[in-house]
Amino acid sequence: MIELKGISQHFRGAGGTDVHALRDVDLSIDKGEIFGIIGRSGAGKSTLVRVINLLNRPTSGTVTVAGQSLTALNADGLRQARRKIGMIFQHFNLLSSRTVYDNVALPLELAGTPRERIREIVLPLLELVGLDAHKDRYPAQISGGQKQRVGIARALASQPDVLLSDEATSALDPETTRSILDLLRKINRELGLTIVLITHQMEVIKQVCDRVAVLDAGRVVELGRVIDVFLKPRHDVTRALIGEVISQELPPSVLARVESRLVAARERGGRDHLFRLAFTGAGVDQPVLAQAIRNYGLDFNILHGHIDEIQGQAFGSLAILASGESADIDNAMHFLREQGVVVEEINHVV
């Protein structure tokens, strides 16, 4: 659906220095998926989303949407192509002098759409976003979440194939954010719309996205299914972003107890191992730890744990201290991996 190949974007910065906002980005986004792009401030994510509809023309590379090369189009062709790409923003950009209905109708009016046809398009959209009862209200009379719903309906008015969302929930409280994400998921499901969602919040990615690309300094440093990225983050930036949602670090009080335990093990010539386990799907429901303990005669001390949900799928993370013979611990970890558990040794003491 969307193909970005070799995308680089350079700007002339203060003092005449070159700013490399994007560096050789390759992305392929499938039709009908919700694709997340996440990164810290300055990572290049907002530049990237504006490259998709060529609001920013890349310094190099090609942009293809629905089989059409946007970078090869002239001004008129690009204007037509953009009608199939809707966009919502962090700031709602509503006209205060127009009602909810009229704000949604605005792009259709500008395109010269007949009045009756506008009505046929706008009223179902207002019902879809839950604002049919507020169509005659003005922006000052509705909440921030409702304003964003107006922005979403307006972006859908041209009946696009792609919806770009640039930090659309960043200015909203957590409860309103969840309701907007639920709405985007509903739109994706009912309209078959491809959604590209830009955010700096991993919680947003966790709730709604099918796949995610992690940007750092203008480069894609990690790419994959959201559940896989949470299970096996490879890049430090990804780990840090996930850590804001699901703590990957042991609390200080737990660390102090672990250090005492490891020191005692060293003094008696024992061997304790510290592991982080991540599991999902059936692994959450099955007693795999109990089986490992029984099968290999080990002691597992659960130090820290967290269970959450990603796209309706259970996800768990545990930090455990394993005590026993080295060979038995190795065999137990092999057994857990065979059950689909992701095993990472944090530290060990001989």
UniProtKB/Swiss-Prot annotation:
<dbReference type="InterPro" id="IPR003439">
    <property type="entry name" value="ABC_transporter-like_ATP-bd"/>
</dbReference>
<comment type="function">
    <text>Part of the ABC transporter complex MetNIQ involved in methionine import. Responsible for energy coupling to the transport system.</text>
</comment>
<dbReference type="InterPro" id="IPR027417">
    <property type="entry name" value="P-loop_NTPase"/>
</dbReference>
<dbReference type="InterPro" id="IPR017871">
    <property type="entry name" value="ABC_transporter-like_CS"/>
</dbReference>
<dbReference type="Pfam" id="PF00005">
    <property type="entry name" value="ABC_tran"/>
</dbReference>
<dbReference type="GO" id="GO:0016887">
    <property type="term" value="F:ATP hydrolysis activity"/>
</dbReference>
<keyword id="KW-0547">Nucleotide-binding</keyword>
<keyword id="KW-0997">Cell inner membrane</keyword>
<dbReference type="InterPro" id="IPR003593">
    <property type="entry name" value="AAA+_ATPase"/>
</dbReference>
<dbReference type="InterPro" id="IPR050086">
    <property type="entry name" value="MetN_ABC_transporter-like"/>
</dbReference>
<keyword id="KW-1278">Translocase</keyword>
<feature type="binding site">
    <location>
        <begin position="39"/>
        <end position="46"/>
    </location>
    <ligand>
        <name>ATP</name>
    </ligand>
</feature>
<keyword id="KW-0029">Amino-acid transport</keyword>
<protein>
    <recommendedName>
        <fullName>Methionine import ATP-binding protein MetN</fullName>
        <ecNumber>7.4.2.11</ecNumber>
    </recommendedName>
</protein>
<dbReference type="Pfam" id="PF09383">
    <property type="entry name" value="NIL"/>
</dbReference>
<keyword id="KW-0472">Membrane</keyword>
<dbReference type="InterPro" id="IPR018449">
    <property type="entry name" value="NIL_domain"/>
</dbReference>
<dbReference type="GO" id="GO:0005524">
    <property type="term" value="F:ATP binding"/>
</dbReference>
<keyword id="KW-1003">Cell membrane</keyword>
<comment type="similarity">
    <text>Belongs to the ABC transporter superfamily. Methionine importer (TC 3.A.1.24) family.</text>
</comment>
<keyword id="KW-0067">ATP-binding</keyword>
<comment type="subunit">
    <text>The complex is composed of two ATP-binding proteins (MetN), two transmembrane proteins (MetI) and a solute-binding protein (MetQ).</text>
</comment>
<dbReference type="InterPro" id="IPR045865">
    <property type="entry name" value="ACT-like_dom_sf"/>
</dbReference>
<feature type="domain" description="ABC transporter">
    <location>
        <begin position="2"/>
        <end position="242"/>
    </location>
</feature>
<dbReference type="InterPro" id="IPR041701">
    <property type="entry name" value="MetN_ABC"/>
</dbReference>
<dbReference type="GO" id="GO:0033232">
    <property type="term" value="F:ABC-type D-methionine transporter activity"/>
</dbReference>
<dbReference type="GO" id="GO:0005886">
    <property type="term" value="C:plasma membrane"/>
</dbReference>
<keyword id="KW-0813">Transport</keyword>
